[in-house]
């Protein structure tokens, strides 16, 4: 029951904050819900296509991450992970290492330049 309350509060908070000034900031990290060491986080990762999706999600096929789903439309990734095995910071670094910018880290420049042309996006 307590977990349900936390999830509802997190989603209400997210809904309220995301309805505000969209022009002010493109990078709003969603709330992280943690219960018993398991967390769900949503944040922005720049990319373009299904090849990007495969690479981004593939970078998170590591111990501790049980789900990673990146949307080509919204550029948001939803990640379910075990906080006793991996941190959100490590998750964001893993994505940057394969060449993709996210809210916290810029993708590796050399790796980015080696991405297929369809995967190269306007960098911030």
Language model segments and positions:
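Bacterial N-terminal signal peptides that target proteins for export
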Residues: 1-7
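Hydrophobic helical h-region of N-terminal Sec-dependent signal peptides
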Residues: 8-13
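C-terminal motif of bacterial Sec signal peptides marking the signal peptidase cleavage site
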Residues: 15-18
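Short, low-complexity, disordered segments immediately C-terminal to signal peptides
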Residues: 20-34
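Post-signal-peptide N-terminal segment of Sec-exported extracytoplasmic proteins
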Residues: 36-76, 97
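Helix N-cap motif at beta-to-alpha junctions
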Residues: 82-88
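Conserved short beta-strand edge segments in small beta-sheet-based binding/regulatory domains
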Residues: 99-111
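Short, low-order "capping/linker" segments at domain edges
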Residues: 113-124
